[in-house]
Amino acid sequence: MKKMISRRNFLAAAGVVAAAGVLTACGGSSNSTAASASTAASGAAASGDTIKVGVLGPLTGDVSVYGQAVVNGATLYLKQVNEKGGINGKQLEIIAMDEQGDATQAVTCFTKMCDQGITALVGDVTTTPTLAIAAESADYNMPMVTASATAEAVTYDAETDTVNENVFRATFTDPFQGIKMADYAYQKLGYTKAAVIFQKGADYNEGLAENFVNEFESLGGTIVDQETYSEGDVDYKTQLTTILGKAPEVVFCPNYYQEVGQILAQAESVGLAVPFLGGDGWDGLEGYATADQLKDAYFCANYAKGSNPDFEDAYKAEYGEEYPNGFAPLGYDAAMTVVYGIQAAEDAGLAAGDDDYKQAVIDAIAGGTIDGITGTFTFDEHHNPVKQTAILCFDGATPVLKEMF
């Protein structure tokens, strides 16, 4: 029988810079520990009264908006555990590092964290660095929970039918999102003709696009056009004009919010006045598109604003701003998942960091039920969370929950 971990009330916590010490790139100082944990446990580390947890993400660079949110959420939860007395009296020591959105830096960070004695990792954030760490982590059998990396290959190699036994995720996968949005477009919205525009060569974009196309066609729909662009492109008018000529009822645009804003504006300029759909990369779109451009648009996400007012109020009180996107609650849930596993290993009386300890963490997570900010979830045979998705529409230009689907 699977065990349940209850959602913890969100408590006041130190800001990320205060709570995680000096957050540096991996080439810098490796002394990136949580101030809260370090203060509580100064002089106690040698006695085994602390448990080291890595928290890794891009805190600088193009995708830092995601990394900062994940690290904020994770740090808040880990500090909360410490404020409640830790795990069986032991404090959590946070080893937090900035991988700058780079896969090579991510591996360097992970290796340094292992050298410092972490027992589990919350990270990474985006797909490509997470894939690199997942491959490296197997040699350490390091328990690893990514908050937000969506590529199927993070936890499962389809070519060899092999599960990455030590790796889990709190978010849903690229295939899941593509399939869900195809189902929603065809079954709930009634569209039968769709076009797709996405960045070629990008794991996230291609993963969503491929699964949307396959599912939409399997339901009886028609994909009238598929258009691609390259990384760094800023002019999409040629592709959008081609789509316009194919007369779709809806366009699936599985890209990140900065590009989505540009695509929506250019679609309006060429006269492509049909609804657009997207995945969780749209989270953060507010301010990048107008109400007219977002009319009848939908996207899927792990979390919808208003789902947990206590969480949102506490985040705003602590950081002086509203939570930036759905990556913050995912970071919180990823940390909760890691702590669930650590609790089981500690209850078994194992020595933190040894092979049996890490395996106990992995086994507990695989069989656990997490009651998180993004909903209650278990893990399937590929270590993906089993949960509903939030479908968001727009009130003007503000995303709001339409329904759970």
Please provide the spans of the model-predicted regions.
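Bacterial N-terminal signal peptides
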Residues: 15-21
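C-terminal motif of bacterial Sec signal peptides marking the signal peptidase cleavage site
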Residues: 23-25
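Extracytosolic ligand-binding ectodomains
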Residues: 2-11, 27-405
